[in-house]
């Protein structure tokens, strides 16, 4: 075999090994990115659930406080508490 053919075979082998290595590493990186995406989605869902629970608590507190304090609406539709004074 000539030197040129030997170099061609070695070059093809090196190129093949490099391509297998490159594709393998690329798959690992993509798998990590997909896993990170799932973790971010789980975190977003957790935050959304916490915010929804906070909203529900705030709505319950508002109903409770409005039932305890007399509330009126003025001409602009704004809510105001009426001041009640106790005279002894």
UniProtKB/Swiss-Prot annotation:
InterPro entries: Pet117. The keyword Mitochondrion applies. Keywords: Mitochondrion, Transit peptide. GO terms for cellular component: extrinsic component of matrix side of mitochondrial inner membrane; mitochondrion. GO terms for biological process: mitochondrial cytochrome c oxidase assembly. The keyword Mitochondrion applies. It is found in: Mitochondrion. Coiled coil: none annotated. Belongs to the PET117 family. Involved in the assembly of cytochrome c oxidase. This is Protein pet117, mitochondrial. It comes from Schizosaccharomyces pombe (strain 972 / ATCC 24843) (Fission yeast).
